[in-house]
Amino acid sequence: MPAWFLSIMLTIMLVTGGVAAPRQVSEQAAGTYPIPVLMYHHFSQNVDEALASRMIILGDNFEEQMRFLREQGFTSLTYNDYLAVLDGEEPMPARPVLITIDDGYESNYTIAYPVLKKYGLKASIAVVVSSIPDIYGKNFPGYPHMSWAQMQEMEGSGLVEFHNHTFNLHRDVNGKPALVARLDGEGEEAFKYRVRGDLIQARRLLEEHFQKPPNALSFPYGAWDQAVMEAAIDTGHRVFPTYRWGYADGNSPVLPRILIDDIPIAEFVQIVEGKTRQGKNP
């Protein structure tokens, strides 16, 4: 049994209220740890729009951050790259960083992707599959999402991977995140069956369009519990980005992340250099 699987089982045992218990940050392997896992969502060229939400970053600021990573010799890893390290197939590179994006907004293609290409950096995008406009023939006013064609172009570059952010569980149900919310009168087996069905539907569509299954499941709102994790593992997912603030340690497939928005570049530098040891995602 792979060491990473034993690690995830231990993490599940420590789950309390859908949030994994804190882990000690490892300081091993020639100073390659802690590993910053940067989390982005939407990108904009409009200052007022960017200031209105912590989930939006100005394109110019994103470029400044990516330029720093390239100039300072960071190695960008995708979720699949990280999994290869966990499986012992690849060594951990010097100065690793994961650039991760959630939801699948079209700004990932129009703003973030050109920057990634310019600096030769890799990123992983977790998509809410039901929000892809090709699915239902409509898009979201104000915050359009990427089409399959746009995503396939990005994936074909070798710089971007696409992963699962559920099919249609990025919403609220009875005041709770849908991924963990039980419907009225729903038992645990029925709940797990429903969650598995959603994850399988998203996974099938992603595999159909990219000719490979998504290995990562990014939990909407960072919410998960033991039943959700079991369903995720049962459906073939092996890397689990969360919303909990912190650094990855290179040993666990459950990844804390750090939300990045329009922070000063000096603060960004402190984060990616591993010098910011306490924080909280909004």
What annotation goes with each model-predicted range?
Residues A94-P96, T100, N108-A112:
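Membrane-embedded segments
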Residues H237-Y247:
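Acidic, His- and aromatic-enriched active-site or binding-groove loops in soluble protein domains
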Residues G17-V97, R244, P253, R257-I260, ...:
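N-terminal pre-catalytic segment of deacetylase/amide-hydrolase enzymes
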Residues P2-P22:
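Sec-dependent N-terminal signal peptides of Gram-positive bacterial secreted proteins and lipoproteins
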Residues A29-P34, E90-P93, K117-G120, M154-S157, ...:
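Extracellular/periplasmic catalytic domains that process cell-envelope and extracellular macromolecules
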Residues D81, T100-Y105, K118-L121:
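Substrate-binding cleft of extracellular glycoside hydrolase catalytic domains
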Residues F43-N46, R95-V97, K117-D225, V254-L255:
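Metal-dependent polysaccharide deacetylase catalytic core of the NodB/CE4 family, i.e.
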